[in-house]
Regions:
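A short, conserved alpha-helix in the catalytic core of glycosyltransferases
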Residues: 193-253
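Active-site-adjacent helix/loop segment of glycosyltransferases
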Residues: 6, 143, 233-315
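Short, acidic, metal-binding catalytic loop of nucleotide-sugar glycosyltransferases
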Residues: 21-31, 52
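Short, flexible, basic/aromatic active-site loop/helix in glycosyltransferases
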Residues: 158-201
């Protein structure tokens, strides 16, 4: 059987190409690429990416538009072109739709396009995943851009209502280091020491993780109601409700460059999106009551106003 690699591309074909090149250098496991262009606004992105894939994989590559008929069996490489940027969750769902259709794919690896493979970890992660009935999701240890520092986001505890409230209160001024302390409590790995054994985690990094296709489909994979942020929190809640766990395999590593897609969006848009996702997550998955939700709504609204004014005055001073 085969692992389907779903890579989301948005205005960053160079990152996607670098990601694929890194995989091709080290991987020895049977795979299929499903690259989703998530409505790139730059008209040169899709042609450049498609030309690269055709040159690299020749007849083993196809280009699909969003409404094209899905082949029963996908080739080695598929580039799916989406008309609109629908965000992380919905963009990946488009790739998952293709993977679900292909009976040769039994395992799915979700990868950010700014991830660089340094280890041949697909086969080992598959073994860990399929040999443990309690586990639905596995992830390698993820390093930051420098290739040495551990990205603590790869092993986290789930965000609580208290944490979300504190985040939006102290994000502009972390009085007494309250937010920093709460963030430290959120991270399972804080000392940059590589763990000697596998770690059960509540929340993985969305930049690189592996799941069993059938189980991922059963929990309805990503929630389409978020555009950006809180996708991992929601995924963690779904997996927990299903009675399964997430596992970090620290023996194998990859590098996450970070910020490739979000840097191409305005600061106000990103902040507003994070607020919408936080409200949705708190209401549906943390199941907060009416009073707690109103408190969250007021605090996030004030935080957004502060953010907009701060950006406005910063631009005025800069100009």
């Amino acid at each position: 059987m085969t692992t389907g690699l779903i890579i989301l591309n948005y205005n960053s074909s160079d990152d996607t190409i670098n990601c694929i090149e890194s995989i091709e250098r080290v991987n020895t496991s049977p795979i299929k690429y499903i690259i989703v262009d998530n409505g790139s606004s730059n008209p040169y992105i899709v042609p450049k990416l498609n030309d690269y894939l055709k040159s690299k994989f020749a007849s083993k590559h196809i280009l699909l538009n969003e409404n094209d008929k899905i082949p029963d069996i996908l080739p080695y490489s598929t580039l799916l072109v989406s008309k609109n940027n629908t965000g992380y969750a919905c963009g990946n769902k488009k790739g998952l739709k293709l993977a679900y259709h292909d009976k040769e794919i039994d395992t799915i690896l979700i990868i950010n396009n700014d991830v660089i493979f340094i280890d041949d970890f697909i086969s080992p992660l598959r073994r860990w995943l399929w040999n443990d009935d309690k586990t639905m999701l596995v992830s390698p240890l993820i390093l930051k851009r420098d290739g040495e520092t551990i990205d603590p986001n790869c092993a986290r505890r789930k965000k609580t209502y208290r944490y979300i409230i504190a985040w939006f209160i102290f994000i502009f001024s972390d009085i007494f280091g309250i937010l920093r302390k709460m963030q430290k409590e959120l991270f399972i790995i804080n000392n940059n020491e590589i763990p000697s054994q596998n770690i059960k985690i509540e929340m993985p990094s969305g930049s690189c993780f592996m799941v069993k296709k059938k189980e991922f489909k059963q929990i309805d994979d990503f929630d389409p109601n978020t555009f950006l942020y809180y996708e991992e929190d929601i995924l963690s809640a779904k997996i927990s409700d299903y009675g399964k766990q997430c596992l970090l395999i620290p023996t194998y590593t990859c590098i996450h460059i970070g910020g490739s897609s979000t840097n191409k969006r305005s600061s106000n848009f990103i902040f507003r999106t994070s607020i919408e996702s936080a409200r949705y997550y708190a209401k549906k998955y943390l199941k907060v009551g009416f009073t707690k939700y109103i408190i969250l709504y007021i605090i996030t609204s004030l935080s957004l106003i502060t953010h907009i004014f701060k950006n406005y005055f910063y631009k005025r001073i800069k100009n």
